[in-house]
């Protein structure tokens, strides 16, 4: 076989074998059955899908009532001081707010899917609102 000329190559710097730590060596020598059992973990996305199905089945309000009521009162302060609210009025506002947010997230998800993504981003919300005509 004919000899070929060797060209110089840059070394990639192979790693030298390191000494094992005492804990690693002890772990390897210990029997596998005597170890602590790992807690069960679902695959990524499984719990998310379960939560989606659960919340789509349910009809209860998802935002806590008192924090929402405080937010409504805080926003109302900017328009008129000493406003009073019937409890049914706050409930109606909360129903409408949650319905709006659910619809917005549905449209946002469609925008993310259109961009060949599964993760929603702020730009998806902005696009959904722009298409709806809520913000120019």
From Swiss-Prot:
Modification Phosphoserine occurs at: 11, 29, 58, 87
Modified residues (N6-methyllysine): 5, 10, 19, 24, 28, 37-38, 57, 65, 80, 123
Modified residues (N6,N6-dimethyllysine): 5, 10, 28, 37, 80
Modified residues annotated as N6-(2-hydroxyisobutyryl)lysine in this record: 5, 10, 15, 19, 24, 28, 37, 57, 65, 80, 123
Lipidation (N6-decanoyllysine): 19
Subcellular location field: Nucleus; Chromosome
SMART domains: H3
A cellular component annotation (GO) from this entry: extracellular exosome
List of residues that carry Citrulline: 3, 9, 18, 27
Listed result of changing residue 111 to A: Abolishes S-palmitoylation
Pfam families per UniProt: Histone
Annotated positions of the Phosphotyrosine modification: 42
Phosphothreonine sites (modified residues): 4, 7, 12, 81, 108
Positions of post-translational N6-glutaryllysine modification: 15, 19, 24, 28, 57, 80, 116, 123
Protein name: Histone H3.2
Gene: H3C15
